[in-house]
Amino acid sequence: LASRVAWREPMSGIARWLDGQVRKLGVDLRLNTQATEASVLAEKPDEVIIATGGVPNRGRFAESDLVHTSWDILEGRIMPAEGQSVLVYDDSGDHQGVSCAEYVATRGASVEVATPDKHVAFRLGPTNRPIHVRNLHKAGAVMTPDVRMSGVSREGNRVVVVLKNDYTGAEEERVVDYVVVEHGTLPREDLY
């Protein structure tokens, strides 16, 4: 997912390199395979390394069918069409939210990135943040700091998002085609 934004494509080489190194050692890799306790024990392994990964955290909107995650966009399950509006609510301040926003903005969607932080991509350092922000500006994205997403509802075939300012308590509504939330990742704990 990290390599979906064009300037971060070289990141995909890390996974390829790691895969090659492990295979050189003769490790039997089982990727993209549903593992259960029974299926693992049936193999009678000498050693087991479980890298369960995680799932996107939807935060307080976990039960809502009105919000998507940055994973939905970056994995290609959802792709707003050119001209459609997207609000990306980035509560993590890391690469995922701004990468998602940049990805859809550079493909012609109208994008707003809202965050409770004092600026977009708050947790990124001085090397990566300026690149994301520059690319978002070039694509015409709007960046709105100091707000929390406090509500989401359907209005016809669009979605109404309520953003609440952390300092004043003032609320504003946005009516968009897609809402994407980035709240980080939850560990997959079903195997242990």
Give the ranges of each region predicted by the language model:
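Short beta->alpha junction loops/turns
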Residues: 4, 93, 184-185
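Short glycine-enriched, charge-decorated loop/helix-capping segments at active-site entrances
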Residues: 2-8
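Hydrophobic transmembrane alpha-helical segments of multi-pass transport and channel proteins
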Residues: 76-77, 95
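Rossmann-like NAD(P)H-binding beta-loop-alpha module
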Residues: 82-111
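Short amphipathic alpha-helical segments
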Residues: 1, 60-63, 100-102, 191-192
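A Rossmann-like FAD-binding core segment of flavoenzymes
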Residues: 12-57, 66, 71-75, 82, ...
